[in-house]
Amino acid sequence: MSARSTFIGGSLAAVLVLAVAGPAAAHDDHHHHGHDRTAVQQVNLVADLPGVAATTDPELVNPWGLSRGPNTPVWVSDNGTDVTTVYRTDVAGSPVTKALSVAIPGGAPTGQVFHDATDAGNFVVTENGKSGPASFIFDSESGSITAWNPQVDIASAVTVAQGDNAVYKGLALWKTPLGSFLLAADFHNGRIDVFDSEFRRLAMPPTFFNDPKLPAGYAPFNVAVIGDAVYVSYAKQDAEKHDEVDGPGLGFVDVYTDFGQHRERFASRGPLNAPWAITVAPASFGKFAGDILVGDFGDGRINAFDNRGHFEGPLRGSDGKPLAIDGLWGLLPGTAANGGTDNLWFAAGINHEADGLLGLIGPAKS
């Protein structure tokens, strides 16, 4: 399916800015808690290699994005096997069970989001005479946007849009007073692509989601929505502008409000090393509770920042050493139904992305 592009003219752009402008950015709403540092522990649940985790699944290769609904299992983008796999567990320590595997047309999925199917008029998937609102939406390094509805095709997502020479590394669902939009991080072209609720790519003014102060050679690596704010992580491009260059200090994070026009630098260099995952620390994480957590793919560390971007330190194990997960990609808060509210799900492309690991990070057991 060829990309459809709609230009937002000056008057509509102005309306968008006014409609979403408001109080301070959402990251100001996350209050820092001054408790003692909480040590964390990593629990491996699923891996493609036998003996690494309690459950073995050969389809779990280089898992990137994670998503889930309030009561759904966790969905995982398996970049190395061109599928998304779905896993269910509880908080009582029972083994993980695999609920489903869904093919991703175009392959190499990266980011993904959950879409509430009760929002019936938006993000509608149609194929072979069947239609329904997407439950999960994916992007990929092939430049494809795909969406899944179980009544349309339970075994495969459907291609709904295609970016122009795009290499999408991350995806976010952004709900605004003017409707819902998809934000896709195009690492190759160095931009955030915006899609409306009919999967039409919008030709945004160049000032939207743009940081002119970035050094040359950096591009959006991932995008996340927290409250009303949009966080964009940036990594250094390789010569082909397809993959990131890892290294200490190679990374930035910006936070955007006012429909992408107002930008603040949230974090620069320092502990950042190809930052990808962005999420909020659970209340169980001691002094880091409510902080913004940024996961580095480059060194596998998870760094905590307060609501103004002040570096608080890395998550550490009970031995006092920074937790480092080889090939770290996604981080996702657990729920009471799946994983537990005290924990974070993590996904990692271990062994230089040749294999995969899924598990939980939570407070260390004393």
Task: Go through the PLM ranges and name each one.
Residues 1-26:
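Secretory targeting and sorting signals
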Residues 24-366:
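Sequence/structural signature of beta-propeller domains
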